[in-house]
């Protein structure tokens, strides 16, 4: 199993470079034929959301659609997948940034919730708590 960098997933999702997109599709097809998976680090998911939002102007619904599509891709294996799923659910339901959703979900997965924060939006997450003054 190999790991993937953010730029590979960006190229695959936005499909703005035919040559690179073709190479990525071939890589995924090859992994499927060998019944292998490719590893996606949690930090890649954080960076991917940021790139889609800031560089490609994806709106929140489009980001959710893209990230959920990745989770459904059989050839991809995610670091701490329960945290990714929980973060996406929290992001879909609330107003907190995706990064805060990931941080809180990662705390939850490790049994360290709530995540203490000074961010009022993040504090509304089920796995977070506003640090009182």
Predicted regions and their residues:
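Acidic, PIN/NYN-like endoribonuclease modules and their adjacent C-terminal/linker elements
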Residues: 104-133
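Short, well-structured N-terminal submotif of metal-dependent ribonuclease cores
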Residues: 1-40, 55-62, 68, 132-133
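Residues that scaffold the ATP/ADP-binding catalytic core of kinase and kinase-like folds
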Residues: 11-13, 51, 125-126
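Short beta-strand scaffold positions
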Residues: 4, 39-40, 78, 98, ...
